[in-house]
Structures are given as C-alpha cells and as structure tokens.
Amino acid sequence: MTKQMLLENVSFRYGKTGPLIVDHVSCEVYSGDFIGIIGPNGGGKTTLTQLMLGLLQPVCGSISTYSVQDHRPLSIGWVPQHFSYDAAFPITVKETVLSGRLATLPWYGRYTQEDHEAAEEALLTVDLIDYKDSCFSHLSGGQIQRVLLARALAARPEFLLLDEPTANIDPVNQQKILQILSALNKHCTILMITHDLHHTAGCFNRVFFMNKTLTTLADTTTISERFCCNTFGRCP
C-alpha cells in the first residue's frame, strides 16, 4: 500500500486562546482506503477535513501528502456538506460540473475540449448525463448531491473527501451515491464523514472516530451507534 496522507500530532483551535477543536491527531491514509469518519456533532470532523484540504492551518503538528503520480502534488476532490447557491441563477448541470475544472483553466480562461470531456465523464459516472443541459436549481436534493460529487470528480482526483454526502436525501439517491463511491474506490482513496452508520459502515475498510482526538477502528463489522455510545460515551 502507498501512503497518501500522514497527520502527525495535529492540533487546531480558533483564535489564540480558544479550546482545541482538534487535539494531537495522528493517522495515516493509504492508497485505496475507504475510510468513514464518525463522531458527535462538534467533535471536529469537518475541521479535520478542512485541515487535510489545507483550508485551515494547524497550530501544531504536520500534515504531509504523497501522490502516486510522480512529481505531482496529491490531487484532492472535496464534496462539502452545505452548498449555497442562488436558485434564480440560470446555470446548467454541466456548467456546475465544469466549475470543478476552474483550477486547471489555461491563462486565457476558457474551458478546453479536455475540460468538457472530463465534465461529461463525471456526469456519466454519477448517472446524470441526461440532465447535463437541465437547470441545476430544478434538480432534487439527491440529484444535486450527485452533481456536487461530479463537480469534484471533474478534476480527476486521486483522493476524495466528502462531508455527509448521504445526509437529508431520499433512500434511492443515498444508495446510488454509495454504489458510485464503492466503484470509484477501485482507483480513488476516499474519506467520508457520516452519521448514517446503518447504511454506510459496510463500505469502509477503516473507521476514524473523531471527538477532538482520533481513534481508529479497524473492524468495521462491529460498528454501530450503540457501540460508539458504549465505547466512547458519545454517539455519532
């Protein structure tokens, strides 16, 4: 297995004197992992992923990333929990997915043929290619979540971070997203925050329980809400 991310004694707080939100967390993530991140609200799960993305900087400790592609930085895709948009803005599904390619635009700022091909490939992956010309705001909540996943996939990442991608959507789209992620895991490392242990625990090869500190649970077959409450005193 190839190491893709290493966290060593990472801590984070907001402000100079605030309490630690992430408290001396250490872990390793390997190529091909499908890791669930569980824990109570306020336990630091989202903050941990923002540190992994480089959106926040730790007050101590270090985060190292390693690409399986020589001489390139690790490419990370990100699917946030909350996504705000103006429902009156007439953007199509494909245009939304294309925005995931903004970081790769050439100096003249126009999407290339490769960008369009990557966007359509991502829409095929999430089974929404027939909606590419539809207005984004006309989609259901579950379809929107799949479009956001496609937007992350458009950049063809090696490593995918998701913050509760199956929360507050219908069961059909929940199952669809989990099937898509399981297929993607054949060539993409995945870390996913979730509260839905009943449907998701079987997807993971490891689980991180995050409540300011981090505990790694290797046997995912025994993980349940009751297990977490009994073991850690807090429920996810």
UniProtKB/Swiss-Prot annotation:
ATP binds at G39, P40, N41, G42, G43, G44, K45, T46. Keywords: ATP-binding, Cell inner membrane, Cell membrane, Membrane, Nucleotide-binding, Transport. It comes from Chlamydia trachomatis serovar D (strain ATCC VR-885 / DSM 19411 / UW-3/Cx). InterPro entries: AAA+_ATPase (IPR003593), ABC_transporter-like_ATP-bd (IPR003439), ABC_transporter-like_CS (IPR017871), Metal_Ion_Import_ABC (IPR050153), P-loop_NTPase (IPR027417). This is Probable metal transport system ATP-binding protein CT_416. Belongs to the ABC transporter superfamily. It is found in: Cell inner membrane. It comes from the Bacteria. The lineage of its organism: Bacteria, Pseudomonadati, Chlamydiota, Chlamydiia, Chlamydiales. Part of an ATP-driven transport system CT_415/CT_416/CT_417 for a metal. Probably responsible for energy coupling to the transport system. The keyword Repeat does not apply. It is a peripheral membrane protein. Residues 5-236 form the ABC transporter domain. GO terms for molecular function: ATP binding; ATP hydrolysis activity; ATPase-coupled transmembrane transporter activity. Its main location: membrane. Pfam families: ABC_tran (PF00005). One of its GO terms (cellular component) is ATP-binding cassette (ABC) transporter complex.
